[in-house]
């Protein structure tokens, strides 16, 4: 799987255009409300996504946040849209009305009623939902990103109609931390969203990458580390990033989904730098130094391709199984396109060297979901 990081300049326009033509489904606690916008235009690339009979074969159900988040949701949706358009398959997007299990279950049921043959869900909020519904809908194939079906307090159990894709976020974070220190930054910040496993892995890797570079360059690094308990833009996130920049932090790894916009706004005001997350976010703000990315688009398109090649059901290598993608599989990394490469001292040759080391597993990187990594030259500043 090659690096297929998304260029964000055209993403929002394409997505918003698709949503005009697709069925936009919103859910309420009392039932389902469908909103159809019938506006169409000539020569539309998303034309094949429109269903003549009101059914949609591929269903995407997002988690918390907006679809056009320039990251996690948007990257996955781009993969779905690209594959479906190329293969003339109908597809639709369903957003739960609120952040509750009931709303997410209602989204799954709506997608099923609308003819979904495969339902793609994102993130930990769907663990319990799919754990209960994988057996209720045995003929529907489920693709879970960044999560596995798991009932409360129990181990994950995957039915044969479920396939899960996880990522080694610690490796992406490692690359970002290493690059930031090699670039010359000595005062870093990590501002995570909710304290969940993928975010923890990003943070742990960021610390370890900064430590490795600091040891090589014999530098002392300070790193503020905190979670904000949200993936949405907020005044609180903006205020926290303002405090950090004013306190001397030079670059913040904004590992908090849509809330990264709040960090970028502050960085623009205070001449700070930001490290984006999940996808190439260089087009979102000129303050984005780089982005610790996951190849969500490539992972989704490859999974769909394999599914349809096998007649619309998961193959033996996928059915009831989980794969984890890292540098070895080229599933994580920093964007290398010219317009996204904003380093002055850290070169692409430096990047390729450290990336090869990860692929060959020359460095042992801890996931960091249990304990914080130990450091000598990176001095962590945690909230009291």
Sequence positions of predicted segments:
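N-terminal amphipathic/basic-hydrophobic helices that include classical n-h-c signal peptides
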Residues: 1-6, 33-36
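A residue-level marker of the well-folded mature domains of exported/periplasmic proteins
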Residues: 33-384
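C-terminal motif of bacterial Sec signal peptides marking the signal peptidase cleavage site
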Residues: 26-29
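Short, linear, compositionally biased motifs with a strong N-terminal bias
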Residues: 21-24
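Bacterial N-terminal signal peptides that target proteins for export
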Residues: 3-18
């Amino acid at each position: 799987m090659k690096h297929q990081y998304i260029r964000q300049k055209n993403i929002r326009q394409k997505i918003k255009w698709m949503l005009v033509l697709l069925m936009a489904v919103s859910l309420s606690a009392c039932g389902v409300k469908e909103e159809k916008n019938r506006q169409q235009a000539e020569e539309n690339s998303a034309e094949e996504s429109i269903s003549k009979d009101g059914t949609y074969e591929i269903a995407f159900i997002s988690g918390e946040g907006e679809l056009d988040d320039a990251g996690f949701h948007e990257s996955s949706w781009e993969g779905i849209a690209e594959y479906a358009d190329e293969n003339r398959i109908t597809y639709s997007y369903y957003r739960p009305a609120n952040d509750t299990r009931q709303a997410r279950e209602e989204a799954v049921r709506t997608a099923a009623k609308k003819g979904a043959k495969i339902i793609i869900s994102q993130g930990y909020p769907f663990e319990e939902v799919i754990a209960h519904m994988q057996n209720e809908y045995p003929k529907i194939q489920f693709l879970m990103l960044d999560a596995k079906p798991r009932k409360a307090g129990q181990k994950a159990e995957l039915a044969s109609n479920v396939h899960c894709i996880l990522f080694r976020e610690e490796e992406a974070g490692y690359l970002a931390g290493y690059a930031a220190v090699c670039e010359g930054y000595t005062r870093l910040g990590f501002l995570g969203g909710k304290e969940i496993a993928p975010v923890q892995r990003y943070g742990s890797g960021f610390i370890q990458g900064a430590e490795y570079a600091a040891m090589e360059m014999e530098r002392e690094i300070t790193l503020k580390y905190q979670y904000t308990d949200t993936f949405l833009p907020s005044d609180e996130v903006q205020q926290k990033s303002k405090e950090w920049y004013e306190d001397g932090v030079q670059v913040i790894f904004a590992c908090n989904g849509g809330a990264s916009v709040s960090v970028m706004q502050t960085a623009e005001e205070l001449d700070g730098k930001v490290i984006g997350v999940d996808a190439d976010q260089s087009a979102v703000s000129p303050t984005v130094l780089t982005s610790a990315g996951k190849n969500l688009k490539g992972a989704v398109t490859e999974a769909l391709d394999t599914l349809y090649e096998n007649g619309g059901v998961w193959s033996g290598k996928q059915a009831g199984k989980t794969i984890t993608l890292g540098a070895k599989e080229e599933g994580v990394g920093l964007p290398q396109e010219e317009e996204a490469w904003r380093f002055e001292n850290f070169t692409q040759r430096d990047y390729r060297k450290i990336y090869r080391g990860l692929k060959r597993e020359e460095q042992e990187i801890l996931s960091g979901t249990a304990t914080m990594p130990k450091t000598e030259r990176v001095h962590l500043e945690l909230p009291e």
